[in-house]
Amino acid sequence: MSTPTTFRPVLERIAEEIERTPGSGRPADYIPALAARDPRRFGMAVAELDGTVYGVGDWREPFSAQSLTKVFTLALDLAREGDALWEHVGREPSGNPFNSLVQLEYENGIPRNPFINAGALVVTDRLHTRTGDAAGELLAFLRAESGNPDLGHDEEVAASEAAHGDRNAALAHFMASYGNIDNPVPVLLDQYFRQCSVAASCADLALATGFLARHGIRADGTRLLSRSRAKQINAVMLTCGTYDAAGDFAHRVGLPGKSGVGGGIIAVVPGHCTLCVWGPGLDERGNSVAGVAALDRFTTLTGLSVF
Protein backbone atom coordinates (compact mmCIF):
# COMPACT_ATOMS: atom_id res chain seq x y z
CA MET A 1 0.00 0.00 0.00
CA SER A 2 1.30 3.44 -0.94
CA THR A 3 2.17 6.07 1.64
CA PRO A 4 1.33 9.76 1.12
CA THR A 5 4.98 10.63 0.47
CA THR A 6 4.83 8.58 -2.74
CA PHE A 7 1.76 10.33 -4.17
CA ARG A 8 3.73 12.84 -6.23
CA PRO A 9 5.73 10.35 -8.32
CA VAL A 10 2.61 8.22 -8.76
CA LEU A 11 0.68 11.20 -10.11
CA GLU A 12 3.54 12.17 -12.42
CA ARG A 13 3.67 8.64 -13.81
CA ILE A 14 -0.09 8.62 -14.39
CA ALA A 15 0.04 12.00 -16.14
CA GLU A 16 2.81 10.77 -18.45
CA GLU A 17 0.75 7.70 -19.36
CA ILE A 18 -2.37 9.78 -20.02
CA GLU A 19 -0.37 12.23 -22.13
CA ARG A 20 0.91 9.38 -24.32
CA THR A 21 -2.65 8.23 -24.95
CA PRO A 22 -4.45 10.11 -27.74
CA GLY A 23 -7.34 12.20 -26.42
CA SER A 24 -10.57 10.23 -26.61
CA GLY A 25 -14.17 10.81 -25.73
CA ARG A 26 -16.24 13.89 -26.46
CA PRO A 27 -17.18 16.82 -24.22
CA ALA A 28 -20.84 17.05 -23.26
CA ASP A 29 -22.63 18.64 -26.19
CA TYR A 30 -26.16 18.89 -24.80
CA ILE A 31 -24.93 21.79 -22.63
CA PRO A 32 -23.45 24.15 -25.24
CA ALA A 33 -21.22 25.97 -22.75
CA LEU A 34 -19.37 22.69 -22.07
CA ALA A 35 -19.03 21.55 -25.66
CA ALA A 36 -16.04 23.77 -26.46
CA ARG A 37 -13.70 22.15 -23.91
CA ASP A 38 -10.57 20.50 -25.34
CA PRO A 39 -10.90 16.75 -24.59
CA ARG A 40 -7.11 16.50 -24.28
CA ARG A 41 -7.00 18.59 -21.09
CA PHE A 42 -6.13 16.60 -17.97
CA GLY A 43 -5.64 17.34 -14.29
CA MET A 44 -5.48 15.25 -11.14
CA ALA A 45 -5.14 16.05 -7.44
CA VAL A 46 -4.84 14.01 -4.25
CA ALA A 47 -5.63 15.55 -0.86
CA GLU A 48 -4.37 14.01 2.37
CA LEU A 49 -6.45 14.06 5.53
CA ASP A 50 -4.53 17.08 6.87
CA GLY A 51 -5.22 19.14 3.74
CA THR A 52 -1.90 18.65 1.97
CA VAL A 53 -2.57 18.48 -1.78
CA TYR A 54 -0.52 17.00 -4.62
CA GLY A 55 -1.39 17.59 -8.24
CA VAL A 56 -0.37 17.22 -11.87
CA GLY A 57 -1.46 18.67 -15.18
CA ASP A 58 -4.35 21.14 -15.14
CA TRP A 59 -5.08 20.46 -11.47
CA ARG A 60 -5.65 24.12 -10.62
CA GLU A 61 -7.80 24.88 -13.70
CA PRO A 62 -11.45 25.52 -12.77
CA PHE A 63 -14.01 23.39 -14.62
CA SER A 64 -17.75 22.87 -14.35
CA ALA A 65 -18.40 20.62 -11.36
CA GLN A 66 -21.87 19.57 -12.58
CA SER A 67 -22.99 16.33 -10.88
CA LEU A 68 -20.02 16.28 -8.51
CA THR A 69 -22.00 18.81 -6.48
CA LYS A 70 -24.65 16.18 -5.78
CA VAL A 71 -22.36 14.58 -3.20
CA PHE A 72 -22.13 17.80 -1.21
CA THR A 73 -25.83 18.69 -1.31
CA LEU A 74 -26.60 15.14 -0.19
CA ALA A 75 -24.22 15.53 2.77
CA LEU A 76 -25.62 18.94 3.69
CA ASP A 77 -29.21 17.70 3.63
CA LEU A 78 -28.44 14.47 5.49
CA ALA A 79 -26.76 16.56 8.18
CA ARG A 80 -30.03 18.46 8.63
CA GLU A 81 -32.83 15.91 8.27
CA GLY A 82 -31.10 12.58 8.71
CA ASP A 83 -32.78 9.36 7.62
CA ALA A 84 -36.07 11.10 6.80
CA LEU A 85 -34.48 11.95 3.45
CA TRP A 86 -34.57 8.28 2.44
CA GLU A 87 -38.37 8.34 2.44
CA HIS A 88 -38.13 10.59 -0.63
CA VAL A 89 -35.21 9.10 -2.56
CA GLY A 90 -33.83 5.57 -2.77
CA ARG A 91 -30.34 4.11 -2.56
CA GLU A 92 -30.37 1.62 -5.43
CA PRO A 93 -28.59 1.75 -8.81
CA SER A 94 -30.92 2.74 -11.61
CA GLY A 95 -29.45 0.95 -14.62
CA ASN A 96 -30.92 3.73 -16.78
CA PRO A 97 -29.52 7.00 -18.14
CA PHE A 98 -29.09 9.70 -15.49
CA ASN A 99 -31.95 11.84 -16.86
CA SER A 100 -34.44 9.01 -17.48
CA LEU A 101 -38.15 9.44 -16.76
CA VAL A 102 -39.04 5.76 -17.11
CA GLN A 103 -38.44 4.46 -13.58
CA LEU A 104 -40.14 7.42 -11.90
CA GLU A 105 -43.50 6.37 -13.27
CA TYR A 106 -43.08 2.77 -12.15
CA GLU A 107 -41.95 3.87 -8.68
CA ASN A 108 -44.51 6.58 -7.96
CA GLY A 109 -42.23 9.59 -8.18
CA ILE A 110 -39.52 8.28 -5.83
CA PRO A 111 -36.12 8.41 -7.59
CA ARG A 112 -33.87 5.38 -7.37
CA ASN A 113 -30.89 7.24 -5.85
CA PRO A 114 -29.67 10.77 -5.07
CA PHE A 115 -27.15 10.88 -7.93
CA ILE A 116 -29.42 10.54 -10.94
CA ASN A 117 -30.95 13.87 -11.91
CA ALA A 118 -34.37 13.13 -10.42
CA GLY A 119 -32.83 12.16 -7.08
CA ALA A 120 -30.55 15.19 -7.04
CA LEU A 121 -33.54 17.45 -7.70
CA VAL A 122 -35.28 15.98 -4.65
CA VAL A 123 -32.20 16.52 -2.47
CA THR A 124 -31.75 20.10 -3.66
CA ASP A 125 -35.45 20.75 -3.10
CA ARG A 126 -35.29 19.51 0.48
CA LEU A 127 -32.07 21.39 1.22
CA HIS A 128 -33.65 24.56 -0.18
CA THR A 129 -36.68 24.10 2.06
CA ARG A 130 -34.40 23.88 5.09
CA THR A 131 -31.96 26.68 4.22
CA GLY A 132 -33.78 29.07 1.89
CA ASP A 133 -30.83 28.97 -0.53
CA ALA A 134 -29.54 25.50 -1.38
CA ALA A 135 -27.09 26.75 -4.02
CA GLY A 136 -25.72 29.38 -1.65
CA GLU A 137 -25.36 26.83 1.16
CA LEU A 138 -23.44 24.54 -1.19
CA LEU A 139 -21.12 27.32 -2.34
CA ALA A 140 -20.36 28.39 1.23
CA PHE A 141 -19.51 24.79 2.13
CA LEU A 142 -17.21 24.32 -0.87
CA ARG A 143 -15.40 27.58 -0.16
CA ALA A 144 -14.85 26.63 3.46
CA GLU A 145 -13.67 23.07 2.80
CA SER A 146 -11.39 24.00 -0.11
CA GLY A 147 -10.04 27.14 1.52
CA ASN A 148 -10.80 28.99 -1.72
CA PRO A 149 -13.04 32.04 -1.16
CA ASP A 150 -13.08 32.76 -4.90
CA LEU A 151 -15.14 29.71 -5.86
CA GLY A 152 -18.29 30.74 -7.68
CA HIS A 153 -20.94 29.90 -10.24
CA ASP A 154 -20.27 29.99 -13.97
CA GLU A 155 -23.21 32.10 -15.09
CA GLU A 156 -22.75 31.11 -18.75
CA VAL A 157 -23.08 27.44 -17.85
CA ALA A 158 -26.08 28.09 -15.60
CA ALA A 159 -27.83 30.01 -18.39
CA SER A 160 -26.96 27.30 -20.90
CA GLU A 161 -28.42 24.61 -18.66
CA ALA A 162 -31.58 26.63 -18.07
CA ALA A 163 -32.05 27.11 -21.81
CA HIS A 164 -31.68 23.37 -22.44
CA GLY A 165 -33.25 22.06 -19.23
CA ASP A 166 -36.56 20.69 -20.47
CA ARG A 167 -35.81 17.15 -19.31
CA ASN A 168 -34.98 18.32 -15.78
CA ALA A 169 -38.15 20.41 -15.78
CA ALA A 170 -40.13 17.34 -16.80
CA LEU A 171 -38.56 15.29 -14.00
CA ALA A 172 -39.36 17.97 -11.43
CA HIS A 173 -42.96 18.44 -12.57
CA PHE A 174 -43.52 14.68 -12.63
CA MET A 175 -42.25 14.27 -9.06
CA ALA A 176 -44.27 17.29 -7.95
CA SER A 177 -47.39 15.52 -9.23
CA TYR A 178 -46.64 12.78 -6.68
CA GLY A 179 -46.05 15.30 -3.87
CA ASN A 180 -42.30 14.64 -3.75
CA ILE A 181 -41.26 18.25 -4.47
CA ASP A 182 -41.94 21.04 -1.95
CA ASN A 183 -40.86 24.19 -3.78
CA PRO A 184 -42.25 25.71 -7.00
CA VAL A 185 -40.57 23.96 -9.91
CA PRO A 186 -39.08 27.17 -11.43
CA VAL A 187 -37.49 27.99 -8.06
CA LEU A 188 -36.09 24.47 -7.74
CA LEU A 189 -34.69 24.47 -11.28
CA ASP A 190 -32.95 27.82 -10.71
CA GLN A 191 -31.32 26.42 -7.56
CA TYR A 192 -30.34 23.20 -9.31
CA PHE A 193 -28.81 24.88 -12.36
CA ARG A 194 -26.83 27.25 -10.12
CA GLN A 195 -25.67 24.28 -8.06
CA CYS A 196 -24.42 22.37 -11.10
CA SER A 197 -22.70 25.44 -12.56
CA VAL A 198 -20.14 25.74 -9.76
CA ALA A 199 -16.65 26.11 -11.26
CA ALA A 200 -13.86 24.52 -9.22
CA SER A 201 -10.47 22.91 -9.74
CA CYS A 202 -9.25 19.40 -8.98
CA ALA A 203 -7.45 20.82 -5.92
CA ASP A 204 -10.63 22.51 -4.68
CA LEU A 205 -12.80 19.44 -5.11
CA ALA A 206 -10.30 16.95 -3.68
CA LEU A 207 -10.08 19.11 -0.55
CA ALA A 208 -13.85 19.61 -0.37
CA THR A 209 -14.43 15.85 -0.47
CA GLY A 210 -12.08 15.29 2.47
CA PHE A 211 -14.87 15.00 5.05
CA LEU A 212 -15.79 11.63 3.55
CA ALA A 213 -12.26 10.28 4.00
CA ARG A 214 -12.28 11.67 7.55
CA HIS A 215 -15.51 9.78 8.32
CA GLY A 216 -17.70 12.90 8.52
CA ILE A 217 -15.21 15.41 9.97
CA ARG A 218 -14.85 18.78 8.22
CA ALA A 219 -11.56 20.53 7.48
CA ASP A 220 -11.90 22.68 10.63
CA GLY A 221 -12.31 19.61 12.84
CA THR A 222 -16.05 19.94 13.41
CA ARG A 223 -18.35 17.03 12.63
CA LEU A 224 -20.72 17.37 9.67
CA LEU A 225 -21.94 13.77 9.61
CA SER A 226 -21.83 10.77 11.88
CA ARG A 227 -19.38 8.08 10.89
CA SER A 228 -22.34 5.93 9.86
CA ARG A 229 -23.82 8.57 7.54
CA ALA A 230 -20.43 9.24 5.94
CA LYS A 231 -20.24 5.50 5.28
CA GLN A 232 -23.71 5.62 3.72
CA ILE A 233 -22.66 8.34 1.26
CA ASN A 234 -19.48 6.47 0.33
CA ALA A 235 -21.55 3.33 -0.25
CA VAL A 236 -24.04 5.10 -2.51
CA MET A 237 -21.14 6.70 -4.41
CA LEU A 238 -19.68 3.24 -5.02
CA THR A 239 -22.93 1.71 -6.24
CA CYS A 240 -24.56 4.70 -7.97
CA GLY A 241 -21.97 7.42 -8.50
CA THR A 242 -21.00 6.91 -12.13
CA TYR A 243 -24.37 6.82 -13.85
CA ASP A 244 -25.17 3.43 -15.38
CA ALA A 245 -21.48 2.41 -15.40
CA ALA A 246 -21.14 2.02 -11.62
CA GLY A 247 -20.41 -1.70 -11.80
CA ASP A 248 -17.64 -1.22 -14.33
CA PHE A 249 -16.18 1.67 -12.31
CA ALA A 250 -16.15 -0.43 -9.13
CA HIS A 251 -14.53 -3.27 -11.07
CA ARG A 252 -11.80 -1.05 -12.53
CA VAL A 253 -11.19 1.50 -9.76
CA GLY A 254 -12.50 -0.02 -6.54
CA LEU A 255 -13.29 3.28 -4.81
CA PRO A 256 -16.41 5.30 -4.02
CA GLY A 257 -16.62 7.86 -6.82
CA LYS A 258 -18.88 10.44 -8.39
CA SER A 259 -18.60 11.67 -11.95
CA GLY A 260 -19.98 14.69 -13.74
CA VAL A 261 -20.50 15.61 -17.38
CA GLY A 262 -18.05 18.48 -16.96
CA GLY A 263 -15.38 15.76 -17.06
CA GLY A 264 -14.64 15.58 -13.35
CA ILE A 265 -14.59 12.57 -11.04
CA ILE A 266 -14.13 12.68 -7.27
CA ALA A 267 -13.10 9.55 -5.37
CA VAL A 268 -12.59 8.61 -1.73
CA VAL A 269 -10.10 6.34 0.01
CA PRO A 270 -11.70 6.25 3.48
CA GLY A 271 -9.17 6.97 6.21
CA HIS A 272 -6.45 7.90 3.71
CA CYS A 273 -7.14 10.56 1.07
CA THR A 274 -9.48 11.97 -1.55
CA LEU A 275 -8.95 12.50 -5.26
CA CYS A 276 -10.31 14.59 -8.08
CA VAL A 277 -9.46 14.04 -11.73
CA TRP A 278 -10.59 16.05 -14.74
CA GLY A 279 -10.66 15.21 -18.43
CA PRO A 280 -13.47 16.73 -20.55
CA GLY A 281 -13.67 13.86 -23.05
CA LEU A 282 -16.59 11.63 -22.02
CA ASP A 283 -17.51 8.07 -22.90
CA GLU A 284 -20.99 7.05 -24.05
CA ARG A 285 -22.20 6.87 -20.43
CA GLY A 286 -21.08 10.37 -19.52
CA ASN A 287 -17.89 9.53 -17.60
CA SER A 288 -14.46 11.03 -18.24
CA VAL A 289 -12.36 8.62 -20.32
CA ALA A 290 -9.06 9.98 -19.00
CA GLY A 291 -10.46 10.28 -15.49
CA VAL A 292 -11.50 6.64 -15.19
CA ALA A 293 -8.19 5.51 -16.70
CA ALA A 294 -6.22 7.69 -14.26
CA LEU A 295 -8.09 6.42 -11.20
CA ASP A 296 -7.68 2.84 -12.43
CA ARG A 297 -3.91 3.38 -12.61
CA PHE A 298 -3.86 5.12 -9.22
CA THR A 299 -5.44 2.22 -7.36
CA THR A 300 -3.29 -0.28 -9.26
CA LEU A 301 -0.04 1.56 -8.52
CA THR A 302 -0.78 2.41 -4.88
CA GLY A 303 -2.88 -0.53 -3.74
CA LEU A 304 -5.33 1.95 -2.20
CA SER A 305 -8.80 0.49 -2.68
CA VAL A 306 -11.79 -0.47 -0.57
CA PHE A 307 -11.40 -4.06 -1.82
Curated annotation (Swiss-Prot):
SUPFAM superfamilies assigned: beta-lactamase/transpeptidase-like
Keyword annotations of the record: Hydrolase
Binding site for substrate: S67, N117, E161, N168, Y192, Y243, V261
Keyword Hydrolase tagged: yes
Enzyme Commission code(s) on record: 3.5.1.2
One Pfam match: Glutaminase
An MF annotation (GO) of this entry: glutaminase activity
PANTHER family documented for this protein: GLUTAMINASE
HAMAP family: Glutaminase
Subunit structure: Homotetramer.
Name this protein carries in UniProt: Glutaminase
